[in-house]
Amino acid sequence: MRFDETHLKELYLQRLVFDGYIGLQYERGKPTDIDQIVLSGKTDDYYLLEVKEKDLCKREPKGFGMDIERIGFFGDLKRQIGMETYYFIKQIKDQRTREFLQWRYITMTDFFKYCLKENVEGGIGMRSENSKNYTWICPENHFKVYP
């Protein structure tokens, strides 16, 4: 099987940036799970995007959560390389029908500023049923609607 050389170079460079440089481990890369890096046409600044599909939290405050470890990761990343992360939510009606409602977003700086610093057990998502998944919830009113 032959692979397109251009595609392989793009993939290699992407992994080098994400896992090598942004992963903050130059000798041995650490996977970062960053969804995208974008260049703002208005400011010429680069931003990181974290994208999740979620429905509103069932308990008060109504809002969207993020794993505490992820919140810390994005805070560390901003301190070390200076890039802001935007947290985009593909808001769905519920977990059963997954009906799309709208796109919502917030900077991770604002998420941390407004979220309730109370550990809430998050959904199962990609973890095992026997592990803990503590999250912090940011009230919905702090998320903007993406046009």
Which residues does each predicted region cover?
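Intrinsically disordered, low-complexity terminal regions enriched in charged/polar residues
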Residues: 97-147
